[in-house]
Amino acid sequence: MKGALFIGLMGVWSVALAEEKYPSGMTILETPKGGETQVVTGNKAEMDVAREPASTFKVVIAWSALDRGLVQDVETPLDGAEGLGLRQSLQKSINPPFALLAEKLGGEVLGEYAVRSGLIEGQIPRGWMKAGGQEAAHAADLKTTLRREHSMAVAWMRGTAPWDGEAGKKLQDALVWKGEKVLLRAKTGSYGGCLWMTGYGADKAVTVFMEGPVSRRPEILKAFFGRWGVKPSTP
């Protein structure tokens, strides 16, 4: 467990902004840049339930590829991405380029980065990528928790280890959602009945989670962007 990723998460929990209306079953965590984490809506008991990270695991693949030199920048088109670079591939959560990168990295190397990231709960199973890179794009055999997802976003926001190196800084450029009214960096995930959006702006980090089908993804985006008082321009 990486202590740096859990800064601020063990403070006093509180429910904030009770006037907001959110779908039943949605949990939102929010951490001001210099403050403590709040449960905006949902149940604190959900914090440590093991769940599939879905496409939020693509940030680990991206970070690994940047650190290993497989990807040099966020705009150069990736193999399998139909002309899109790393940033747009992350935002659109396109599977093929990340499956290809995962295969080039290999399960052992990618597993090491997964551990370093602090995102994954427990040990990385042996042979976890036996089905190939496509499995890695969703990390179906790995588990995370709401606490870990949010810890990662807080560490991004605060620029702490392990995201403070050159590759981690490039990843922050890749996480930018272009064309929005406020500058936000985030990643979505929707797979195996788990819907995620985790990231940060200049003032706070936010993680939104809900169980449900992919068709409810717009609700996740609406809740995430709504924490900054804006609506997402993309569905």
What are these regions (language model features)?
Residues 4-14:
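Bacterial N-terminal signal peptides
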Residues 66-83, 163-168:
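Short, well-structured active-site flanking segments
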Residues 44-52, 76-88, 95-104, 133-141, ...:
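Second-shell loop/turn segments in exported
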Residues 15-52, 224-231:
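Beta-lactamase-like hydrolase cores
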Residues 49-72, 89, 206:
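Active-site SXXK
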Residues 63-71, 100-103, 151-158:
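Short glycine/serine- and small hydrophobic-enriched flexible loop segments
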Residues 86, 100-153:
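Mid-domain, small-residue-enriched loop/turn segments at the edges of structured enzyme/sensor domains
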Residues 21, 46, 50, 103-109, ...:
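Structured C-terminal helix/loop/strand segments within mature extracytoplasmic catalytic/sensor domains
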